[in-house]
A protein has these predicted regions:
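Short terminal alpha-helical segments
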Residues: 1-38
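Alpha-helical rod/repeat scaffolding segments in eukaryotic adaptors/tethers
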Residues: 6, 39-53, 73-84
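Intrinsically disordered, low-complexity regions enriched in small/polar residues
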Residues: 11, 40, 52-55, 85, ...
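Amphipathic alpha-helical interaction modules
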Residues: 24-68
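Amphipathic alpha-helical binding modules
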Residues: 72-105
Length: 105
């Protein structure tokens, strides 16, 4: 794909991520709050608080993967694979906290 060409599914992915950010603001905020708590924590609390952060990120990642997969299932296999790559890349740019393991879901 040319660097000057917009991704094929960019518009639908933008709308999906807009919807995620509106409907799941609590999940995004919780992950941010958990990370802030971990960063402020004393050493003896840090491990548990990091686990809480990871759990919050996993929740967001699962929700995003569900959105991706439900749309992907409406496409043929080749287009579905292209859409999945574009979706995962868009999550990495827009919501990087939730992108680290999205390709594993």
């Amino acid at each position: 794909m040319s660097p000057f060409r917009r991704a094929r599914f960019a518009d639908v992915i933008d709308r999906q991520l807009d919807l995620f950010e509106r409907e799941h603001r609590d999940v995004i905020d919780e992950a941010e709050e958990k990370l802030e708590a971990y960063n402020r924590a004393e050493r003896d609390e840090a491990e548990e608080l990091y686990g809480d952060y990871v759990d919050a990120v996993e929740t967001g990642t699962e929700l995003l993967a569900d959105i991706r997969d439900h749309f992907k299932w409406t496409l043929d296999e080749e287009l579905g694979e292209q859409y999945e790559r574009e979706f995962n890349r868009a999550v990495g740019k827009r919501l990087p906290r939730f992108s680290l393991e999205i390709d594993l879901r």
